[in-house]
């Protein structure tokens, strides 16, 4: 009889640990309420004007009372998650709803501080718009016994309708940097010597922050880790000081096309503290006026002038969202310059007026052969114009 009893208890325990495929294992909290909510994601605009970056295919929602996780639920939908329904939780005041989308974190049982301390690193997978992490956090609100609905339209049947008509905002952790277009209009003094073909060129992030936080007013991490898409001679912007790391990330390099670019993470440029700028660069062969590779003695002359390296490659670097170099800006630059901010798309229009440089990680003359216009919009897009 005892064996039968223990066997039945074991089956009951197994049944209690089983969970719905849409749910994390729930915290051990006595529940008397549920929370459902609608989300609002940012404007649908990706680096290549692809809309897939706005899609949420996995969303984890957590309910917190102070540091205690009182409820958690994960929903996965290939077609996109727009809401999460019926999160079991406990009623009470000063509850906070925290969400993380498109992630691979283990979140069950984590305190609020632990979740808000999570970080992410820039990887090749991030250049696929489907793998962009998004986060959101509500203001404190009261959960009442029964059904609670957050962000649903007014008139929704509910025991407690919170933030009626205003869904929970969920925003991307990443930012976008891209070339909206590159034109070549060689100035008079160069027309008889040089040309450049963007269609045959490549683009790369010369300097990009490797990691960031996923929550907070600023996501800039306190690490000094950076990535590059193509190796160039060291310069003033190169992360080579003590304590800094600078690693190759091949996904930060691709062929030039209108709208081509990369997803990057928040960063801040501060020369006094050796915080590096984010640099987007187009590079390729510096050609003669007829569009042919340079030959001697023209190649040596161009190398000596600092226009290209030994194999004739010239670089046109742009410091993204930099306040200087004669860059022209338009759009919603509401969060300042000399930094990369989450959920912003920095679209750079480039007008090449002369040869580039062989030291793209060094400061360039203000009157360099580059006109830059940058637009910032909320996805947010920043349009930046540069002239070389």
From Swiss-Prot:
Keywords: Cell outer membrane, Fimbrium, Lipoprotein, Membrane, Palmitate, Signal, Virulence
Family indicated by similarity: Belongs to the bacteroidetes fimbrillin superfamily. FimA/Mfa1 family.
Annotated localization: Fimbrium; Cell outer membrane
Record organism: Porphyromonas gingivalis (strain ATCC BAA-308 / W83)
Assembly, per entry: Fimbriae are composed of a major, structural subunit (FimA) and the minor components FimC, FimD and FimE. Head-to-tail oligomerization of FimA molecules mediates assembly of the fimbrium stalk, while the minor components probably form the fimbrium tip. Linear, head-to-tail oligomerization of FimA is mediated by a conformation change, facilitating the insertion of a C-terminal beta-strand into a groove in the N-terminal domain of the following subunit. The anchoring subunit FimB limits fimbrium length and is important for solid fimbrium attachment to the outer membrane.
InterPro entries the record matches: FimA_C, FimA_N, Fimbrillin
Single GO MF annotation: structural molecule activity
Protein's name in the database: Major fimbrium subunit FimA type-4
